């Protein structure tokens, strides 16, 4: 987490019995209201994101630029208890504020991360729900899509070097999967979805955990490709990762 800085602005908001706040980038947004985080508010300017996630993200054509809105939803067994409610542990520990500030910290390290625009939470008692709004990277395709279409021609080495770069900066990505690795038209790689991510001292255990999670997702999303083919491509990714890590790049 990074400290509050001059380019951040914080404004309170209310919704029925709920009390919340919005943390936003004052360089991009002159002001922020809770409506920004409602897809209904945007009407036809909001389009569901089709790939990955749980149906909780939208592309937004906003006056301040092409953006992505994402609501925080629970997964697994927790979703049966509460769809979008999290235990309140303070504003700075909300999922949205933590991700907003982590993204800012990564951008300060010159890493390829979308620019966070605004983060929102609404609290009622001991529970809260949250959302985040960020800049959209135009013309990108996920590694999952590239692997399905191009197979061995997908950017495996580039992916390995990209991950090594983030790991060198200490990013422990909580959900490193093939949907969260993007490549633009110029071949530049990006990482997205930093919910529950943290900056740590680089260590083997969590780096290996990230990479194993990515391999599992590649196998799961392989389509008609064989597991053997995916594993061969992963070997190329891992070799490039190890070389970049050992060089310190």
Swiss-Prot record:
It is a peripheral membrane protein. It comes from Stenotrophomonas maltophilia (strain R551-3). Belongs to the protein kinase superfamily. KdkA/RfaP family. NCBIfam families: PRK01723.1 (NF002475). The lineage of its organism: Bacteria, Pseudomonadati, Pseudomonadota, Gammaproteobacteria, Lysobacterales. This is 3-deoxy-D-manno-octulosonic acid kinase. It holds the Pfam family Kdo. The active site is at 175. It catalyses: an alpha-Kdo-(2->6)-lipid IVA + ATP = a 4-O-phospho-alpha-Kdo-(2->6)-lipid IVA + ADP + H(+).
């Amino acid at each position: 987490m990074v400290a509050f800085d001059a380019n951040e602005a914080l404004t309170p908001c209310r919704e029925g019995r709920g009390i919340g706040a919005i943390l936003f980038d004052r360089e991009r947004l002159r002001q922020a209201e809770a409506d920004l985080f409602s897809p209904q508010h945007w009407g036809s300017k909001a389009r569901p994101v089709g790939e990955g996630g749980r149906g909780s993200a939208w592309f937004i054509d906003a006056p301040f630029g092409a953006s992505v809105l994402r609501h925080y939803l629970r997964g697994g067994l927790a979703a049966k208890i509460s769809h979008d409610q999290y235990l309140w542990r303070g504003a700075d520990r909300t999922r949205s504020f933590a991700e907003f500030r982590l993204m800012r910290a990564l951008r300060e390290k010159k890493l390829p991360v979308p620019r966070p625009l605004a983060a929102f939470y609404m609290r009622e008692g001991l529970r809260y729900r949250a959302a985040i709004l960020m800049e959209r990277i135009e013309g990108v395709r996920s590694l999952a899509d590239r692997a399905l279409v191009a197979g061995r021609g997908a950017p495996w080495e580039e992916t390995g070097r990209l991950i090594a770069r983030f790991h060198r900066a200490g990013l422990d990505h909580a959900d490193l999967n093939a949907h969260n690795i993007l490549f633009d038209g110029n071949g530049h790689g990006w990482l997205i979805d930093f919910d529950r991510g943290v900056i740590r001292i680089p260590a083997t255990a969590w780096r290996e955990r990230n990479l194993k999670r990515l391999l599992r997702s590649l196998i799961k999303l392989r389509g008609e490709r064989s597991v053997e083919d995916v594993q061969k491509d992963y070997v190329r990714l891992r070799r490039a990762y190890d070389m970049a890590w050992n060089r310190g790049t």
